[in-house]
């Protein structure tokens, strides 16, 4: 029986619940090539300066938008070209979400981490297909799922022969259009063996809260991120944008890119204290 690795390496970035904090960050969706390079350049510069490992993230297709008319991204083929060029230019690993088994084989030659969206975390065939690529798999815990039930989700990946899996907490449904973060979930999920990531931006979502789109409360991103880092996590997942209020998706919960350096500096200080105790 294969069990989850407690330390997962993605390129030059190490994820472990006892190692220094790592970061998964980028804009919600890949809008254009130029925008991807702009965001990547800012993130690379700040993380190099702060000494934090970076996995760059962006989605080629936002397949679960609230409205049929909402922008979804630039598509798989174009995104893979951009991801490949970003890796060559900046040297960091990259992450994107996949939604079907067929996408796994197409994405894996380029992308370092295949992410399973929260709504799809119980889809057995998708989990198996992602695991069999041999790439690191990051599973978002469903908003409907208890943290201890992630045991079965992780087992679908590890028992398919892939021990390199990350488990991400991104809030739990609390009535209509609202998520809350139960910090007990972090040590519970850590007890399952895999490195745990806290998604600080999707945790402040208000799903469908704007009628035709998702709302959010970005003013609470730092609050929740501080709490998670104080508890102890392997990494943080933070979506960022230069103009969140005009972003095509998830703007209300994304962090302005110019606010990221100060935020990360604070969070790294909390991380050092938490892991020294």
Swiss-Prot record:
UniProt keyword Repressor present: no
Reactions the enzyme catalyzes: D-arabinose 5-phosphate + phosphoenolpyruvate + H2O = 3-deoxy-alpha-D-manno-2-octulosonate-8-phosphate + phosphate
InterPro entries according to UniProt: Aldolase_TIM, DAHP1/KDSA, KDO8P_synthase
Molecular function terms from GO: 3-deoxy-8-phosphooctulonate synthase activity
Question: Listed GO cellular component terms?
Answer: cytoplasm
Localization annotation: Cytoplasm
Which pathway, per its entry?
Carbohydrate biosynthesis; 3-deoxy-D-manno-octulosonate biosynthesis; 3-deoxy-D-manno-octulosonate from D-ribulose 5-phosphate: step 2/3; Bacterial outer membrane biogenesis; lipopolysaccharide biosynthesis
* Enzyme Commission no: 2.5.1.55
Question: Quick one: where is this thing mainly located?
Answer: cytoplasm
SUPFAM superfamilies from the entry? Aldolase (SSF51569)
The EC class name is: transferase
Q: What biological-process GO terms show up in the record?
A: keto-3-deoxy-D-manno-octulosonic acid biosynthetic process
User: Which superkingdom heads the taxonomic lineage of this protein's source?
Assistant: Bacteria
What's in the keyword line of the UniProt record? Cytoplasm, Lipopolysaccharide biosynthesis, Transferase
Q: Which NCBIfam families match?
A: KDO8P_synth, PRK05198.1
**Family affiliation:** Belongs to the KdsA family.
PANTHER family linked: PHOSPHO-2-DEHYDRO-3-DEOXYHEPTONATE ALDOLASE
Protein's UniProt name: 2-dehydro-3-deoxyphosphooctonate aldolase
């Amino acid at each position: 029986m294969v069990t989850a690795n407690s330390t997962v390496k993605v390129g030059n970035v190490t994820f472990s619940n006892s190692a220094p904090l790592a970061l998964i960050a980028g804009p919600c969706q890949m809008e254009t090539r130029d925008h991807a390079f702009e965001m990547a350049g800012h993130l690379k510069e700040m993380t190099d300066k702060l000494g934090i490992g970076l996995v760059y993230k962006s989605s080629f297709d936002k397949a679960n938008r609230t409205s049929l008319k909402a922008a979804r991204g630039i598509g798989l083929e174009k995104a893979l070209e951009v991801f490949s060029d970003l890796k060559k230019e900046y040297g960091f690993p990259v992450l994107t979400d996949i939604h079907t088994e067929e996408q796994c084989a197409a994405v894996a030659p380029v992308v370092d981490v295949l992410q399973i969206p929260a709504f799809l975390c119980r889809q057995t065939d998708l989990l198996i297909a992602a695991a069999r690529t041999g790439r690191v798999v990051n599973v978002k815990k469903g908003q409907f799922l208890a943290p201890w039930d992630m045991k079965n989700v992780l087992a679908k990946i590890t028992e398919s022969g892939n021990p390199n899996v990350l488990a991400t907490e991104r809030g739990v449904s609390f009535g209509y259009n609202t998520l809350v973060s139960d910090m007990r979930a972090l040590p519970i999920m850590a007890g399952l063996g895999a490195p745990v990531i806290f998604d600080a931006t999707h945790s402040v979502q208000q799903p469908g809260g704007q009628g035709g789109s998702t709302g959010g409360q970005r003013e609470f991103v730092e609050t929740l991120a501080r709490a998670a880092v104080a508890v102890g996590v392997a990494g943080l997942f933070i979506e960022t944008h230069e103009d969140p209020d005009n972003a095509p998706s998830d703007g209300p919960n994304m962090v302005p890119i110019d606010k990221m350096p100060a935020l990360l500096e604070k969070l790294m200080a909390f991380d050092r204290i938490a892991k020294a105790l």
